[in-house]
């Protein structure tokens, strides 16, 4: 169940009063797109910090005309009609002031299941006034120095006011990679197609 939050938690600010977007509803044919414009409002009145809200986009079921009656096929049984409603949320973040945020990685561990699937886990530790967002890569380095990309997870975030986030995902079962020897090099970088900036890194020696 969901709970409507009207008062931000300590250290958390909402951005909804400083955002305006349009259009608010559209009708899209198949394989068509729609540009949604977002406007910032009254940012000069905001105190330094991070303000976050979410845009929620969802499909709206086509309503039946009033007075239209459904055809009853079998009056002796009970039927249930499920109408799926698809939606997506996109964070909208306003940042005022200079960032003093940094992130570190801790608790690196690797567990191999009975079927041989390697599961890698770690903790993101966030410090500072802003959220962090980026992509995680894991490379295996063999004792002979061969580097193999064995895992990647995009779009990992640690939002304010949270100080840490525990994360785990499965690595690739790549031929020639021995998860009992060598080491894993872990890098957390900002999301960018041009030149990602490394935010944190770590190393796990395998044995």
Predicted regions and their residues:
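Surface-exposed binding patches on compact interaction domains or structured appendages
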Residues: 1-38, 144
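Beta-strand-rich interaction surfaces with strong enrichment in secreted/lumenal proteins
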Residues: 11, 22-28, 93, 109, ...
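Short proline/glycine- and polar residue-rich coil/turn motifs
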Residues: 26-33, 155-165, 194-196
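Exposed aromatic-hydrophobic patches
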Residues: 37, 163-174
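Terminal connector regions
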Residues: 41-94, 175-207
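Low-complexity, acidic Ser/Thr/Pro/Gly-rich terminal tails and inter-domain linkers that flank the onset
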Residues: 96-113
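Short edge beta-strand/loop segments characteristic of extracellular beta-sandwich folds
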Residues: 119-127, 170
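A short beta-turn/strand-edge loop motif at beta-sheet boundaries
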Residues: 128-133, 176-178
């Amino acid at each position: 169940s969901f709970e409507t939050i009207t008062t931000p938690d300590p250290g958390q600010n909402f951005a909804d009063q400083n955002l305006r977007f349009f259009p608010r509803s559209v009708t899209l044919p198949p394989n068509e797109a729609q540009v949604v414009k977002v406007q910032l409002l009254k940012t000069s009145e905001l105190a330094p910090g991070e303000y976050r809200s979410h845009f929620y986009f969802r499909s709206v079921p086509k309503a039946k005309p009033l007075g239209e009656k459904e055809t009853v096929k079998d009056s002796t049984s009970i039927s249930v009609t499920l109408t799926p409603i698809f939606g997506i949320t996109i964070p909208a973040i306003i940042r005022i002031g200079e960032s003093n945020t940094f992130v570190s990685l801790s608790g690196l561990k690797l567990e191999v299941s009975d079927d041989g699937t390697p599961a890698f886990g770690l903790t993101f530790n966030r410090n500072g006034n802003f959220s962090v967002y980026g992509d995680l890569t894991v490379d295996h380095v063999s004792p002979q120095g061969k580097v193999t990309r064995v895992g990647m997870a995009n779009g990992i975030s640690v939002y304010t006011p949270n100080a840490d986030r525990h994360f785990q995902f499965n690595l690739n079962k790549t031929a020639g990679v021995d998860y009992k020897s060598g080491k894993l090099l872990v890098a957390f970088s900002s999301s960018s197609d041009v030149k990602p900036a490394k935010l944190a890194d770590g190393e796990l020696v395998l044995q």
